[in-house]
Structures are given as structure tokens and as C-alpha cells.
Amino acid sequence: EINYLNDLANKLGRKLTDSEVFGFSQVNSEHCRHKIFNGTFIIDGEEKPSSLFSMIKETSKQNPNDIVSAYKDNVAFIRGPKVEQFAPTRADIPSYYQTEEFQSVISLKAETHNFPTTVEPFNGAATGSGGEIRDRLAGGKGSLPLAGTAVYMTSYSRLGNNRSWEQKMKERPWLYQTPVDILIKASNGASDFGNKFGQPLITGSLFTFEHEEDSRKLGFD
């Protein structure tokens, strides 16, 4: 990538600006282009036939069931039930309301915001909810956010002394936030952003895990 930018600067006959370099770093990031996730893997000298991304896509390709759209936008759609909608006959002029039956399509979206939530739990989780809402609003011809869920996975929270399994390992020094701070602030942030858009956070899951064996420490971080 550095060689590419140097060649580009030579072609333009000038140094690239900070804005151009930072812009390139965003649009050419793994987050946007999946250069690793969708890249070619060569293991022990043998090129693998499928990328990690194509292997995940294969599930819906082999068993589409009620999938309407997947991996073509920033959100997936599945076929929903037939529903009645009470709405104006026309949207461009004053008109009577009517009840009309139509085939609904349900949007599904998962947004991971692990590192931002680790650094700043409230706003990290809030913008995670925001990204999920944004992508569903912009998917296809647009969809309406109705409800959200959240999953939190951290090391042991150590809320009290009555959980013997949490006391078997010494608590590590945390680089950014403690697990209990993440659980409390992230939950507040995800709910707060959803409420501002009329999307309540209605359910979710919470997992905590730590394990030490042969001087090796494992856990949700």
C-alpha cells in the first residue's frame, strides 16, 4: 500500500495530502474491502479454493430458504408474513387512508463494535447501535427499525464475593475499562441510541468467561 501511494504521488507530480492518505486508509481498510477475509489463502504451499468470506456465504447459497437478499448490501432480508398496512392511498397528494395487505420483508442486521466499546463503552456501544440502524434504514429501498438486541461478552465482572469461581483467578490490570464498567456503560449506550431513533432494545445475552491452564490465560476481552 505504501508503494502504491508513492507511485501515485509520482504520477501526480506532488506529495499526497494528509486528507488523501487518511481517505485512502479508510476506503482501502479491511473493514471496507475485506482484503484478508475475502483474500486468497495459501497454506503449506497449497492455495485454498475458497476465501473465509465465500465459505460463510456458502451456507445461504446452499440453503436459501426464505432469504430474499444476503451479502449484497449492509443488511440481510428474509421473507416475512403478510401484513395489513393502514396508510394514505397516495403519498404525493392529500388522499384517503386505506387498509392494504402486502407481503412483508424483514431486515436483519448484526453490528460488532468490540474495540470502540472496550475503549469507551457508552459511546462505543451507542455508535454500534447507530451503525445497525443506519444500515437497515439504507438497505434495499429502505426499512424501518423496530427493535434491537445486544450481546455482551467480557471477562468476569467480579461484582461481589459470593461467586467463588470468579475469585480463583487474580484480576488482571485492565488496559482500558473494567468488565463491570463495560457491562453497565455499554448497556446504557446501546439502549440510549436506540431510544433516540424509536428502536427499543428488547432482549439480549450476557456471557462472562475466564480460564487459566498451564500458565495460559483465556477469557472474553
Model-derived segments and spans:
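Core nucleic-acid recognition elements
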Residues: 1-221
